[in-house]
Amino acid sequence: MAVTDRFARRATLSRSLRLLSEFRYEQPDPARFYGALAADTATLVSDLWLAARGESVAGRTLLDVGGGPGYFASAFAAAGVGYIGVEPDPNEMHAAGPAHAGGPGSFVRASGMALPLADDSVDICLSSNVAEHVPRPWQLGAEMLRVTRPGGLAVLSYTVWLGPFGGHEMGLSHYLGGARAAARYARRHGHPAKNNYGSSLFAVSAAEGLRWAEGTGTLIAAFPRYHPRSAWWMTSVPMLREFLVSNLVLVLSPR
């Protein structure tokens, strides 16, 4: 069984539309948006693990690089996973307020580009929508592989710059260029975007990610995170994937 076979059956058009409908709540109601995304991500990782290892993910240890305030912790705890979140920004760690205070999992304040864990220390290492926010995304990827045990899974998912959501809250203006889009946003709103091009948002292509992953010798799957299975072929088409894949999932298994 290929590692994506189980999840591919869930990757339906109705799932894609359901997740798309939640995106409008990211700013006004983050608990709703991230709660839905966390539940979907826990299912994704559980399916990948079961297909790869032939056993339930329950009882395994997962490191979430860029875990934020804990929405993902609750979803993985419900699946029986031991959760460790790594987050460099204290504001992000407490963004959910009391709703997640004292919740499941443990949290460490640290950078994903220098993880404070020993080699081969977790079963699964996840990074969801973080790589486009750091200046050296493949250093982050290398750290994920370092801390993942042989035979485990490293799942790195990121927003592709030239896709429709690459500009984040700057909207489609990122097609005018990142610096121009950032300046335009600041003029219109009177302050820089939270995801500000050049400091907290960077242009990361699908080609870069695939090239890095293939170069590690550990890549076992790559597919668009939010697309129905019928559209996964886009990942294999240069240029087209930059505009239409939107969010790329790289699944790696260290040896």
UniProtKB/Swiss-Prot annotation:
Which Gene Ontology MF annotations are present? S-adenosylmethionine-dependent methyltransferase activity
Q: Which GO terms describe its biological process?
A: methylation
Q: What UniProt keywords apply to this chain's record, in alphabetical order?
A: Methyltransferase, Transferase
Q: What is its EC number?
A: 2.1.1.-
Q: Name one Pfam family in it.
A: Methyltransf_11
Q: Does the keyword Methyltransferase apply?
A: yes
In terms of InterPro entries, this protein maps to: Methyltransf_11 (IPR013216), SAM-dependent_MTases_sf (IPR029063)
Record keyword Cytoplasm present = no
What is the enzyme's main class? transferase
The entry's family comment says:
Belongs to the methyltransferase superfamily.
This chain belongs to which protein, by name?
Answer: Uncharacterized methyltransferase MUL_1123
